[in-house]
Amino acid sequence: MRTYDDFLMESYQVREKMVADKLRPKYHFLPPHGRWNDINGAVFFNGRYHLGYLQKIRNAPDERDFSSWQHISSRDLLHWTYHTASLDEPLEGKKGDYFNSGDVMDGMEIPTIITNMPRRGICIYQCHDADLSHWTPLAENPVIPIDTDEFPECVIFDPSGWKEGDTYYALIGNKNHRPGYEGDSTSLFKSKDLKQWSYIGPFYKSSRRWTAETEDCACSDFFRFGEKHMLLMHTHHPFNKCQYYIGHYENETFYPEINGQLSHRESLLSGPETLIDDKGRRLFWGWIADARDADEYGWQSIMTLPWHLKPTSENRLNIEPASELQSLRYNPCHVEDLFLEVEQEITVDGLASDCMELKLTIEPHAAQRFGVKLFCSPDLEEQTVIRYDTEQQAFVVDFENASNDKTLSYRCGREVLKSGGLKQTVPFALGDDQALELDIFVDRSVIEIFVNSEVCIVQRVYPMRPDSKEVRLFCEDGRIAVRDIVKWEMDATNPW
């Protein structure tokens, strides 16, 4: 008979393996071990930030995988406490029966989860605890059965919801099969009691000038944004594309006016989730997948840092890192007024690190291509190149030589990125005489680059050499002035 000592020894061995992994991030949240996906159920409640995520544990002997909706909370957005699982394994099926994504409904007096249960349909859970630890299913679950013939044009999948006046609304599914609504879409339902739901119709009509017919509206999140509304989502085809619409909402229909993209396939970022806190901030998290396998390393996937989504006066999107991250800074290093000429590259003393925040102000003077290199080994065998191209009006993150590990597999859905194509291109138009303001967060195997408070570029890289920590600046043509550089080491928030 096995005792707790047996399990404790195994737990110790797993923990030691995690601690020794030089690519395991220190201040980006990730579970203690195992693989997970999709962030769910974000809500600010009773003075705490609460997040859920879908945990998967392989269990080959009975041909099933264990699936649960895990629950964490924090007072400061940085240090997270584990709760018992919000929703535990309720499924009676074979391997592949997982929880699907869901949402804590907005505007509710009683915290309410709406989610899709495989082979059952849309289910609702409510909680009366101050710490949101115990969730009770409605007796009427599933409130929208997956096998119903009542809504033939709807796809029962990935719900989100909110309360408006005395009416509950839910966006159900990532497609709608009504003719004329091809491409990404979702279906609107409403209810007076959370138990009986009526179908309204397609929530919005997508346009091929913005999105392809193959795209869908998964992990939807709909909310007021400035004077408009925003619909946030990700698509499966192409994979790793988080995008949003900003538009107006009227008579139970959303009319998109602006389309924007938060991530590109090479970023491995998907599964967006937001909440609004007691400061009125709309905070965003995304799920960043891995190019390494959990079976070999014992863990897989991380969360983005918390992003603050802000509407501009023109009802467009600005993105900034949450201000709480500043409390992790220590050991500052400040450099001013560096000038680079044609085909010049320099290493800046004092900046080498694999866990830091790096802020730069760069003025391009007739330079077309310039940028910064991170995770550089002294001989440049390993390097990650972040290049801005003024002619192309885009950033190119070149991670072709970011790692000498040739077993990495950057999966984008069914597609695997091949050597020779390990580049991420992110459109960004720099105005005339405008400086580049870069706020770069480096955390061992992930980079997040906030650009002029307008976009955030995410990239996973896996430098293997212990000396791959140098920071270099380069100018390929013209001339640039680097007016200001500040680097801070960043304190760890993960226990290991």
Predicted regions span which residues?
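Functional cores that coordinate and move charged inorganic groups
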Residues: A218-F223
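Short, well-structured alpha-helical interface segments that form or flank functional binding sites
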Residues: N37, C217, L269
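Beta-rich accessory regions
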Residues: E10-R15, H248-W496
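Beta-rich carbohydrate-recognition and catalytic domains
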Residues: M1-D158, K163-A212, R224-E266, G286-E336, ...
